[in-house]
């Protein structure tokens, strides 16, 4: 009985919190089909705000702050984070942003998980924070526009163990970039 009561209270609490903001769906009552779809599209679109490419850096302290591994508030960089030990280097938000680098740890920039060349650097994708992560500039350059996949033999290995090399994927023989196992799922979902 105690488990059931706990479950019921938890369920009721979750349902209460999962409500849309007041008046969010105004104008949808009685609509169906294409008319409803169009109205929902208008509602969703009205809530999206493109902060621009430089605006990504203002979002990263919220979206990519390390609250899990070292829990130190540094930039959570999937290409330099070492989940099982000491990071080779850390970046602080707003410090050491870059365009120029020669070594890992010099600076961090913005990594398009889906390369800009796939969508001709068009808006709004070019500044979509949902798939642009802050990463080490040097490793971002190593990754280049190569797809993410499993590496057969590494030609280059980064300080956290990510690799560049030939693909094991049937039908693709070019170079690929393989992040460490800890972040493969995150990257696959972007």
PLM regions and their residue ranges:
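Bacterial Sec-dependent N-terminal signal peptides
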Residues: 1-21
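Domain-level detector of nuclease and nuclease-like folds
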Residues: 98-190
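N-terminal module-boundary/linker segments of secreted carbohydrate-active enzymes
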Residues: 18-88
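Short alpha-helical segments and helix-capping/turn motifs at coil-helix boundaries
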Residues: 56-64, 92-94, 117-121, 175-178
